[in-house]
Amino acid sequence: MKFGRLGELKHGYNAMTTRDSDMMMDIGYQVMDAGEELSFQDPEQETAFVILSGQAEIRWNGQSEKMHRDSLFDENPYCLHVPRNTKVTMKADTAAEVLIQKTDNEKDFAPKFYRPEDVQADIFGGGVWSGTATRTVRTIFDYSNAPYSNMVNGEVINSPGRWSGYAPHTHPQPEVYTYKFDRPQGFGACFIGDNAFKISHNSWSELSGGNSHPQVTAPGYAMWYSWMIRHLPNNPWNKTRIDDPDHEWLMQPDADEKIWSPTKK
């Protein structure tokens, strides 16, 4: 269990987690200037590139695509996912920020370029608990559409004052959250097991397997976060969810009838 803050991002690579940590993944933000060109090629790790802002051209194996993003909150992402030892070149057409996720994988697979229309977006928590945990969950790739990968990559949009990762639950696989707000002074709270941490812009949390991990954002501030899971050997995350027994009653159809409200008499 760990929590960290990057503050204002610097030009270049801004590291958060490393492959030799409990998270088993290299994760960081690559900040690029307009016109800058960079190449990446990891001999041992698969890699996912998710554009967060700006516009860039990305090239691999003789192919080329444009990635762009004006809003984390209103737009689904572009993502390139490649196996180990694949050379990828990015050229920023404008100032750009890219999330990079990597982990060990001996499997060779065909690179996959995900466009916004390829990303699954679901509304979770709708119609229950007076809407206090309604959020948008985006899944770029997971075990269902990329069983060859050792990773999962997706995003959550928390509306102001709402919860996510709720009701409290666990899974054995490690997970990393990286956070951004619609305003840089935005804040929220991250609960990891029995510990709580203040979420700020460009902070991140490392969720060890077996810990519940609900999140909440303050009223007035919308929160985006990337959720990245590392599969375990012979134990992939396949939408794995173990509900906290203390809060299982919230999952019952009549839960709203049992929740106190000032309008009830």
Regions found by a protein language model. Give the residues of each.
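Glycine- and acidic-residue-biased ligand/ion/polar-headgroup-sensing regions
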Residues: P43-S64, V82, P160-G161, P172-W204, ...
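Extended, compositionally biased flexible segments
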Residues: I27-Y29, A34-K91
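Short, structured patches in soluble enzyme cores that scaffold and shape functional sites
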Residues: R84, A92, I100-N105, F141-Y143, ...
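Double-stranded beta-helix
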Residues: A96-T136, S226-K265
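A short glycine-rich, His/Asp/Glu-containing loop-to-beta-strand
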Residues: L6-S39, G127-V176
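Generic beta-strand structural signal
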Residues: Y78-L80, T86-V88, T94-E97, T136, ...
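Conserved metal-binding segment of the jelly-roll/cupin
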Residues: F73-D93, T103, I199-G220, M228-R230
